[in-house]
Amino acid sequence: MVDPPGNDDDHGDLDALDFSAAHTNEASPLDALDDYAPVQTDDAEGDLDALHALTERDEEPELELFTVTNPQGSVSVSTLMDGRIQHVELTDKATSMSEAQLADEIFVIADLARQKARASQYTFMVENIGELTDEDAEGSALLREFVGMTLNLPTPEEAAAAEAEVFATRYDVDYTSRYKADD
């Protein structure tokens, strides 16, 4: 290779941009900081397992749903324990109803599901408060009266009677035998 005239040295022009330090074996004053550096463990992920448990989502608690379905099976409404509607399910049979009929049917079934859920609140409160207070028969009667009258929660029997009445009057179906069998 021929060197251009005036280029007598053995290095290229880009050597001026090499800012790296020359490799030396001399100890640097910064080497003393190595004594204070955190020790790297072989199981680095194991140290973080405790933090993962804090950030992982727990399984969502399974909510108890209270569902009522009309006798035709065209409308089902599921509510949460507080009476809020969680899910409305319609089958193909609902297509034969007009919009107004369907809205009315959903409303009626949702009200029954709400009563069923609120009756569960009644049972929950009477059982749990009764356990906490160890009430006698008179105290239990007062507690049931308080929960029923003050909180306006129906008993499970009242909710079942309301469902039987609606089904008997609205659909000409006798469901009283169904509720007597549960006794």
From Swiss-Prot:
Residues 1-32 are annotated as: Disordered. Residues 1-16 have a biased composition (Acidic residues). This is ESX-1 secretion-associated protein EspH. It comes from Mycobacterium tuberculosis (strain ATCC 25618 / H37Rv). GO terms for biological process: response to antibiotic; symbiont-mediated perturbation of host innate immune response. One of its GO terms (cellular component) is plasma membrane. Disruption phenotype: Inactivation does not abolish EsxA (ESAT-6) secretion, EsxA-specific immunogenicity and enhanced virulence. The lineage of its organism: Bacteria, Bacillati, Actinomycetota, Actinomycetes, Mycobacteriales.
